[in-house]
């Protein structure tokens, strides 16, 4: 497995690719794909569903069913930008979106201005 490092605002995450290569839109082995949105602002400083204090600049995500603590590699299909997030909240609860990302993750994925992006998601570490 080759390690691809993704720098965050406060921390660096190490992502392990199943393909042995740095993930790109052409070789990304996604567990699921779909529309992602992001949230921040009024939620910053509030408690998430698992009790964490939400940091809009962090690298976290809301997912409807994945266990809290699950680490995901998320890639913006259009740009190829990727980052690792950890599930600490529930959602999204609107439309056909599959994941809601913190503002920090959305910024890393270059999806702030669009608000939504088509993403591919790989489960790196699933908490039981």
Model regions: which residues?
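Secreted/periplasmic proteins
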Residues: 1-128
